[in-house]
UniProtKB/Swiss-Prot annotation:
Residues that coordinate or bind Mg(2+) 1: 248, 260
InterPro entries per the UniProt record, alphabetical: ATP-grasp (IPR011761), ATP-grasp_RimK-type (IPR013651), ATP_grasp_subdomain_1 (IPR013815), RimK (IPR023533), Rimk_N (IPR041107), Rp_bS6_RimK/Lys_biosynth_LsyX (IPR004666)
Listed Pfam families: RimK, Rimk_N
GO terms under cellular component: cytoplasm
Species whose genome carries this gene: Thioalkalivibrio sulfidiphilus (strain HL-EbGR7)
Gene it is expressed from: rimK
Keywords: ATP-binding, Ligase, Magnesium, Manganese, Metal-binding, Nucleotide-binding, Protein biosynthesis
Protein name: Probable alpha-L-glutamate ligase
Positions bound to ATP: 141, 178-179, 187, 211-213
Uppermost EC category: ligase
Lineage, broadest ranks: Bacteria, Pseudomonadati, Pseudomonadota, Gammaproteobacteria, Chromatiales
Keyword Magnesium: yes
Binding site for Mg(2+) 2: 260, 262
Gene Ontology biological process: protein modification process; SOS response; translation
GO MF term (any one): metal ion binding
Length: 301
């Protein structure tokens, strides 16, 4: 097969591993910077061009689209879909996952466990919002944040009010969530491919930090998931409509709660911690599922 990888940098670990895995199975691979792709949006013959040449003959596309280029990246992916190329993750599903509020609303509607979460626009509603999420300590999150950036732990009510007012003053959209203290600064990253959890790791925040993201200096180790945690991860991926994703879960006193569904999860941490060839599993998924014009808009909302 001929496989395209949408990635800004061919040297990144995840991109390199996907290239290696695909080529090891005899596939032709081309890494494309999505920002260098341009499109002819025509009903008779939609096309994509890259550095002056028309892109043709691709059987599948693997989107590795960073949060900062979601709009243009998903537009390029959508054009591949219009051309009948099989997407590992569909553009609409990536858009759902990138909108934290939308994804939480969809997960809530389907009964997936979540931390108590509030959302408001007016500073006049801060008191009521804090009451809804059971007061401090609580977590304030920027809707557009990634890799732990824009996530603040407010340990007192006064601190919470100050942080929320500051973000609102900057016209930033924020979520306010309960702080799951019993998680102890750890979370679970469950890697889902084709409706199955193929690998998992437990991430632990560094000393003095509550965010367990590896980009924030956290550490990772292999972990054994409970059946309920495994089922929660699979259901979350299905609700958002992602074939390949990382589902982040906290172990709370009332069961597993999902804090994020990542549409473009990194491979280095999960492969190192679990010892699983995740890149190879993604290529196997493509081999088993890629067919022309097989884009069906999975999930709803």
């Amino acid at each position: 097969m001929k496989i395209a990888i949408l990635s800004r940098d061919a040297k990144l670990y995840s991109t390199r591993r996907l290239m290696e895995a695909a080529r090891a199975n005899g596939h032709e691979v081309q890494v494309l910077d999505p920002l260098r792709c341009y499109m002819n949006i025509t009903s008779a013959k939609p096309t994509i061009h890259y550095k002056g040449k028309e892109l043709t003959g691709f059987d599948a596309v693997i989107p590795r689209i960073g949060a900062s280029i979601t709009f243009y990246g998903t537009a390029v992916l959508r054009q591949f879909e219009m051309m009948g190329v099989f997407p590992v993750n569909e553009s609409v599903a990536i858009s759902r996952a990138r909108d934290k509020l939308r994804s939480l609303q969809l997960l809530s509607r389907k009964g997936v466990g979540l931390p108590v979460t509030g959302f408001a626009h007016s500073p006049d509603d801060i008191d009521d919002l804090l009451a809804e999420v059971q007061g401090a300590p609580l977590v304030v999150k920027l809707l557009e944040g990634t890799q732990g950036v824009g996530v603040v732990l407010a340990e007192t009510r006064k601190a919470a009010e100050s942080v929320i007012q500051a973000f609102m003053g900057l016209r930033q959209n924020i979520l306010v969530q309960e702080f799951v203290k019993e998680a102890g600064g750890t979370d679970l990253r469950c890697f889902v491919i084709g409706g199955k959890v193929v690998a998992a790791m437990q991430r632990r925040a560094k000393e003095g930090e509550f965010r367990s993201n590896l980009h924030r200096g956290g550490s990772a180790e292999p972990v054994k998931l409970t059946p309920q945690e495994r089922a929660t991860a699979v259901k979350a991926a299905k609700v958002i409509g992602l074939n390949v994703c990382g589902v982040d879960i906290l172990r709370s006193s009332h069961g597993p709660v999902v804090i994020e569904v990542n549409a473009s999860p990194g491979l280095e941490g999960i492969e190192t911690a679990s010892g699983v060839d995740v890149a190879g599993r993604i290529v196997s998924f493509i081999e088993q599922n890629a067919r022309p014009h097989r884009t069906q808009t999975r999930g709803k909302g």
